[in-house]
Amino acid sequence: MLRVKSLLAAFALSSILLAQVPFTQGNLVVVRVGTGVAALTSAAQATFLDEYTTAGVLVQTVAMPTALSGSNLACTNAGTATSEGSLNISADSRFFTLAGYSAAPGTLAIAGTTSVLVPRVIARVGSDGVINTSTSINNVFSAGTVRSAVTDNGNQFFACGSNSGVQSATLGGTTSAAASSALPTNLRCLGIYQSQLYCSSASGTYLGVSSVGVGLPTTAQPITILPGFPTTTGPSSYDFFFADATTCYVADDRVSASGGGIQKWVLSGSTWALAYTLAPLATSTRYLSGTVIGGVVTLYATSTVATGNAILSVVDAGAGSPFTTVATTLANTALRGIRVLAARAAVSFSGTGSPTTVGIPTVGTTGGLPYLGNPAFTLTAGNMPAFNIGFMAIGLGLVQSVGIPVPGAPASFNLYVNPIANTVLLITDALGNATLPLGLPSTSAMAGLPLAVQVISYDGLMLDPLPLGASIAMQILLGQW
């Protein structure tokens, strides 16, 4: 029988051993453009990541390269292009990503350059502080701003800007391929939630948050606005934050009297509806992040003041919730994209299953997402022979991208969990189902730890030397919410 507490203690220990990193879990990381020495202009400006505590204490500043250094390119942003400087963080909190230009500070009218002469750059900054700006794009985004970049694994990236739609690029590459087809091509921010790529736009009839294809596109896929979001003139949507699958917050940079602020959208049935807008006094918001802890949503945003702007926070207690100023930057600098350094709980699936005489076994979860402190989280197995045995193979790490054949098992049998940390015996009920409770403690050091799971089913009616069937693989990411 699985000793859940021992397993989780091992997870915590492995995290603690790797926890000596420059960025601290739970802190805010924000893009800053400019040094403060001179007024911001349309020329390229030095770009930084500033780390703050949620109480507004500046912890450190990490400078992006301003010149070629080894394989790392310069990564700068236009001083007055407020749509540039979006920041993202991978679901496992390992990598921050932002986009910029391979140009020295002071390069005039940087957004008007061609990408052949001035490649657009994707910066990947690890939570360990390692900067990688070796990824460039020289075939699109010419004569326009490059705005946002996002990754799910640190090797494959998506980027967008004022033209060219969504593009996909590979770490260290110099070109990109289209990941979106047709309109819109003028996009603002990208994000990944539960392994689905999303974008925001204020172009044409795409005036809110849209999905890009299904999952993470490998070819050009259509952009589809989420049902219920506006399709007529008015909204000016930028960054967005999914608190859960049915709640999405969107930063709108219009003045509050025109609907600007942080909009709360709620999914009802198959349609999204605007619940209310949280509006700060005397300013608006453009970039947005947040946390959900114990059911309480706390949002962090950067204000729309041109320079010397602020980080704002608000706890969503309903319409009219007050904002607090967390920190203010220097004159002649601008804060843009913002993210909370915190892993998000996620579950995804991959691979192919192998049938028994009753079909392909299933693997899944109940009790909500695998967030730390969730006592109800449970692994499930199904579609196995009734009143029989099976196994839950569990590994600490990523699911194998290529399955491993097992001698004696059917030709279709592939194992995706390797190495296996624990094999748990399952006994199925009359419906061929079994469950494995896996309550998660509130141990923040475990945030971001991956768990690979696969169900193995025994079937004595099969003729193979090893009469086994297998589910597809399930990847679990332990998160803070």
Regions found by a protein language model. Give the residues of each.
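Signature of short aromatic-glycine-proline-rich micro-motifs recurring in repeat-based ectodomains
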Residues: 45, 71-99, 140-157, 162-163, ...
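Beta-propeller blade signature
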Residues: 45-54, 113-128, 263-265
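Structural motif
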Residues: 44-46, 107-108, 119, 164-170, ...
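Short, conserved, GDST-rich strand-edge loop motifs in beta-rich repeat architectures
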Residues: 26-41, 98-117, 205-210, 311
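N-proximal, solvent-exposed segments at the start of the mature chain
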Residues: 343-481
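Loop/turn-rich, solvent-exposed surfaces of beta-rich toroidal or solenoidal domains
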Residues: 234-311
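Blade-level signature of beta-propeller repeat domains, shared across WD40, Kelch, NHL, RCC1
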Residues: 304-344
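Surface-exposed loop and turn segments in beta-propeller and other repeat-based domains
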Residues: 58-79, 123-144, 215-234, 276-284, ...
